[in-house]
């Protein structure tokens, strides 16, 4: 029995019985109180019903208490504060969670929230101008793990990478590759400021020299540019794909911005918005304070972005008449919606925080308020090596690449560490700390817990084979798991699916890492108690019944840790 789901259903039934209303009760929350003094679980249903029925919340709570106290798994109910209903669950109901994990594993880990949601999540979308740096890895891991979580709770998810292959940075890339091409032909070159001086582009020049000789130099500029652009973008994308694959990340779609121009999708989108009355000719408001010399006060085509909550309307054309980057964003969102997405998630870097309102406006307009949109910002990664910050810049050629860090510590450490802080908070990544074998290193601490559970089961199989066979046959008495430490671990195990659901609901993958660290901590504490007090050991040869129950507990811990690591794309370790 999933206690959280069962209580939610019983609250809905009680709401229908007491107030002939189950829809409002369905929005009520079931949470674990921060203070155990307030019971095992808490619900705000009384306050929600009270607001609707214009009744005092405590009066509503008392009526719920009269109905719910009769449930067989409820030990006690207390009313707290303005009307919170706090539940204490009977120990045997918590203990039964272990049986659910071990004997009904597939059902326990299965979550089905809403199969009607078709989510498109765009993440990484790094400009294809060079190797990915460690800052990109944070958005990559966040987006990939969020996609995994959403798939785990049964949403249909498309993972997408937007290839910015139509902007000025691509022009700079082409110019740099052409210089490297000339260098490969024997010409002395200087990389001007503003281009890409990194040595990673030298092989591209050599490949072009080998394939074309000096033929590119005899072509007209447009023909030469087209060939080099196609070649350079594809090579850089191959590099990025490999970096991502080495992190365990694979997108379903790589979508080209240039294709929006080539297929006329931008013009088509603008015409649609004109028919909707959302494009007009006007001037942008002057910047607040001192007028900036680059402020463009010309009459131009603008999108009515302010109608949907943006701070100002947005230009769709540049001064030279070409489409703005914003116009590409409009067409791209339209394309996603036409492909069937009814929920768009954008994962952006800290340097794009100003894009949130404009993206929301785009989707609200084109989705006609029927398509959900969420824009998540991943803050900076402060990369530290031996305590010294490393500044990263593609243009200067001195950045810590994903490839370098992956080679140094491995993908599992990168993936886990990127989830050790909420995405909208800066994160310090210290190469020294992530390689320590101590409780100060969270990935080691969690993996070590998994290894220890495997060790417990292996030891039991070796020392007490007959009892181990009974354990595998499900012959254990879970009521023997009655110590405070055991019940706390069991409650945490039972809350795994609740944690997964919350991670999906709030788009917070870090909850999974935090949960695993917490579970590992409680398990290690009990293990250490066993060193001081033999009664807390998992394998007690003189007490086979208790050993059987604790083998069940250890196995449940192992399965939940493995499930959590699988969700975040980390391989559970069986030995160290």
Curated annotation (Swiss-Prot):
Its EC number is 6.1.1.19. GO terms for cellular component: cytoplasm. One of its GO terms (molecular function) is arginine-tRNA ligase activity. Keywords: Aminoacyl-tRNA synthetase, ATP-binding, Cytoplasm, Ligase, Nucleotide-binding, Protein biosynthesis. Monomer. This is Arginine--tRNA ligase. It is found in: Cytoplasm. CDD domains: ArgRS_core. NCBIfam families: argS. The keyword Transport does not apply. SUPFAM superfamilies: Anticodon-binding domain of a subclass of class I aminoacyl-tRNA synthetases, Arginyl-tRNA synthetase (ArgRS), N-terminal 'additional' domain, Nucleotidylyl transferase. The keyword Oxidoreductase does not apply. It comes from Rickettsia peacockii (strain Rustic). It comes from the Bacteria. GO terms for biological process: arginyl-tRNA aminoacylation. InterPro entries: aa-tRNA-synth_I_CS, Arg-tRNA-ligase, Arg-tRNA-synth_N, Arg-tRNA-synth_N_sf, ArgRS_core, DALR_anticod-bd, Rossmann-like_a/b/a_fold, tRNAsynth_Ia_anticodon-bd. Belongs to the class-I aminoacyl-tRNA synthetase family. It catalyses: tRNA(Arg) + L-arginine + ATP = L-arginyl-tRNA(Arg) + AMP + diphosphate. A motif ('HIGH' region) lies at residues 126-136. It is an enzyme of class 6 (ligase). Transmembrane segments: none annotated. Pfam families: Arg_tRNA_synt_N, DALR_1, tRNA-synt_1d.
